[in-house]
Amino acid sequence: MAIPLITVLSRHCNFSNISVGKDRPKWFDRKKCLQNLIDTKSGEVDLNVKILFDGVQKTDHYVNDFDIPIININGGTGAKSYLRSIEYAKLLKSKYVYFVEDDYLHRQNWDKILLEGLKEFDYVTLYDHPDKYGDDYKNYKSNVRLTKSIFWKEVPSTTDTFACSIKTLKEDFDIHYDFSNRGHQGSLDHLRFLSLKDKGKHLYSSLPGWSTTVLSNYQSPLYDWKSLVDR
């Protein structure tokens, strides 16, 4: 089998303690998020999608409805699940890896946008986190860059949904490992990226966002994300 340019690791589980009780729109559906990830690829980027499943999926779990390889990992918490993900990714032969949590939606041709960023920056996210426009960041100054078809802005941190080269992941593995191993539930993503910035690594977010987490008050702005699941 040919080695893909990008390996997409879509992470799922039967139940998540840190996800329970989060405020989500009524139209949110994890199966539709996974279907959207597949349906919105351009087909022009050499990539391979794999499911990383924390634990053993139930027989009626939606991941079984997809013709996608499933790799079972043993995490048990969000932090340990992310830890198992980076351990798996470190051994990949592809040039890049894209970690995707199970509650994300993507716009059409997200793979082409992602690749533009990966060719330029250490770390890339397609999620334009709305907290960057609140009072906490009103004095924050960011570098803005332009690639072939989109703007990018440097951001201090993002979630566990991001992309980088395997080379970069290996270079920074100790930092990723440390902030996952220290997290009791979540993986301390904010502190992780601040530490990476201190090391001289840079994280850029597409502007506008080309993906979003599906939380009621934290969706990437200026796009009708519900339209992606109404199709």
What are these regions (language model features)?
Residues I6-S19, D54-G55, L126-H129, P208-G209:
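Short loop/turn segments at strand-loop or loop-helix junctions that form parts
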Residues S94-L105:
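Short beta-strand-to-loop acidic/aromatic patch adjacent to the donor-nucleotide binding site
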Residues P25-C33, N74-Y82, T158, H184-D189:
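Phosphate/oxyanion-binding active-site loops and adjacent basic polyanion-contact surfaces
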Residues L105-H176:
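Conserved catalytic core of nucleotide-sugar-dependent glycosyltransferases
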Residues M1-N36:
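N-proximal low-complexity "stem/linker" segments adjacent to membrane-targeting elements
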Residues P25-K26, I166-K167, E171-R231:
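C-terminal catalytic/acceptor-binding lobe
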Residues L52-S94:
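Active-site-proximal specificity loops/subdomain of glycosyltransferases
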Residues L5-I6, T40-K50:
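Short loop->beta transition adjacent to catalytic acidic/histidine clusters or analogous donor-positioning motifs
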